[in-house]
A protein has these predicted regions:
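Non-catalytic terminal regions of proteins
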Residues: 42-235
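Short helix/loop segments within enzyme catalytic domains
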Residues: 1-38
Length: 235
């Protein structure tokens, strides 16, 4: 559950790009580049199929994102599942027994499992909780059109920059600030468009370092040693 929560928060923070990164990383590392409709029963992480399904469900509910954009990403996630899923009508939760063999502990209809993901996303991201002042996580942090515009702008620049250049990290058209989430989302979008992974990764990391230097919290404390307090004394 904790890992599912982390995935949902990642999707709220950097938008559908988080779902793309989940999928490409997992599919690329799998032996046959397939998505399995099965998972080890004690695995704390949702399997690749469930992570893509969560990405789709969160994206569908991002009210601050244009509906056409949401629909396009939802269709993209559906196509990923259709292309890479080993065809199955069931989702299997298994354990390993002596000798390394797999024992199917629970077999759930795949449609029911995907419906469970829909309910899970609703409860984690969009249900108001007393523990956070009767707000939902999506009310506290959510990806919007403004974020998407910034991410696309930075992604476009990442695709055309040279090694010694950096993208424009100034404010967006509505004066919204660029945050690390925008750079992370932009890097994913850029790699999907043109898989020059080392170059785009380096540009993104250097952009994040630049944001780090500009951030008043992370750029360093005004008081480092006890003697520094004299510099800031009002007396």
């Amino acid at each position: 559950m904790n890992e599912a929560l982390a995935d949902v928060c990642g999707l709220l923070n950097i938008g559908p790009s988080a779902g793309i990164s989940f999928a490409t990383l997992a599919i690329g590392r799998s032996k046959n580049r397939n998505i399995e409709a099965s998972s080890y029963i004690d695995d704390p992480h949702p399997n690749t199929l469930l992570r893509i399904a969560m990405a789709k469900e969160v994206t569908k509910r991002l009210d601050g994102l244009d509906i056409k954009v949401r629909e396009a990403y939802s269709e993209f996630f559906d196509k990923l599942i259709e292309k890479y899923l080993n065809k199955s009508d069931s989702f299997i939760l298994y354990s390993t027994v002596e000798g390394g063999a797999k024992n199917s502990d629970y077999i759930v209809p795949l449609e029911s499992m995907l419906k469970t993901v829909e309910i899970l996303v609703e409860k984690i991201a969009f249900t108001r909780l007393r523990s956070i002042g009767n707000h939902s996580l999506s009310e506290i942090n959510s990806w919007t059109n403004r974020d998407q515009v910034l991410a696309h702008r930075i992604a476009t620049e990442l695709l055309h920059l040279q090694e010694n250049e950096l993208p424009d990290l100034s404010t967006g058209p509505d004066k919204q600030e660029v945050y690390s989430a925008h750079v992370a989302a932009a890097a994913v979008l850029a790699v999907v468009k043109k898989p020059e992974i080392p170059l785009i990764t380096d540009l993104a990391i250097r952009s994040l370092c630049e944001l780090y230097k500009l951030d008043p919290v992370w750029s360093g404390l005004p008081v480092w040693y006890r003697s520094d307090t004299e510099k800031h004394s009002p007396m």
